[in-house]
Curated annotation (Swiss-Prot):
PROSITE patterns: NEUROHYPOPHYS_HORM (PS00264). It comes from Lymnaea stagnalis (Great pond snail). Glycans are attached at residue 88. This is Conopressin/neurophysin. One of its GO terms (cellular component) is extracellular space.
Length: 155
């Protein structure tokens, strides 16, 4: 009589338990995706590039009143950022370009040294333009080598 519980055979209960576990999307502390369990369904939601804004349309909308670009930094609450209000009219979320930064990686590096989320911007060392500094350092190094070659009459 131990093989049945409330009139159902134990094999049916075990089968139902295994089936329900295999059909659920669960994550545990170590294997949850960035953003938590609810972000598992983001593959089904399409995203698009955020609207262009700023001088010459070279920036991107980061929030409803924030427009940022590598060439000009960020405009917050200005006429250049006014076009970003239109992002609120879209039902499809937009994808802000830039490396993750800020508290819990909730923002994006949108300009040299600037990290923004949809509400605010802040200076962040993770967003420094390392490629630009590397180019300047290479130029300085080449000039130094050229001067050394002239001093040694190798030129």
């Amino acid at each position: 009589m131990m093989s049945s519980l409330c009139g159902m055979p134990l094999t049916y209960l075990l089968t139902a338990a295994v089936l329900s576990l295999s059909l659920t999307d669960a994550c545990f502390i170590r294997n949850c995706p960035k953003g938590g369990k609810r972000s598992l369904d983001t593959g089904m939601v399409t995203s698009r590039e955020c609207m262009k804004c700023g001088p010459g349309g070279t920036g991107q909308c980061v929030g409803p009143s924030i427009c940022c670009g590598q060439d000009f930094g960020c405009h917050v609450g200005t006429a250049e950022a006014a076009v970003c209000q239109q992002e609120n009219d879209s039902s499809t979320p937009c994808l802000v370009k830039g490396e993750a930064c800020g508290s819990r990686d909730a923002g994006n590096c949108v300009a040299d040294g600037i990290c923004c989320d949809s509400e605010s911007c802040a200076v962040n060392d993770r967003c420094r333009d390392l490629d630009g500094n590397a180019q300047a350092n290479r130029g300085d190094l080449i000039q130094l080598i050229h001067k050394l070659l002239k001093v040694r009459d190798y030129d």
